[in-house]
Amino acid sequence: VLLLAAFYGGARRGTSLQLVSVLGYLFSFLVAVANYQALAKKIELYVPYMSVTADSKLVFYNLDLALDLDKAYYAAVAFIMILFAGWLVTKLICIFANGLRFKRLRFLKGYDWVVAGILNTLLVYLNIYFFFMILSMIPLATIQNLFDKSSTAHFIVESSPIISDYFYRLWITNVIG
């Protein structure tokens, strides 16, 4: 339902305005990649994280990795914070560029709305992935049981094309080692 609403929202915006949003998101993404580790070290005192114990059972991570998972959690939260700040700036820019909503790209002919809908759906899917990925790092039995029982959430975290491997490397491998 969320992805259908995302497609509809993007289709209404049109490709011109949606491209402004995508480019802003891409720029924010690059800034986040460059700066998330420095911010992660600073937010440890302000963002809570439950300690992993020997009894903790995580769906996606073994115990050896889970004992250092707090570092990856802070890295992911820092990344999302930077991305969110960039998203707010992008939304502000989109308010001023709202006239692009009615400008259709000629080379797309009648498919302008489809391209815009797909672009917005991809952005929303990426945000859903971020949400589930951060949840997967929290060693709370209730949350881990949801991942264990939900094949959709499990698929999004573990099998999303391209992004699952990329963010595992970015947040887990690069941070924990």
Please describe what each predicted stretch is:
Residues 1-177:
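Alpha-helical transmembrane segments and their juxtamembrane interface "caps"
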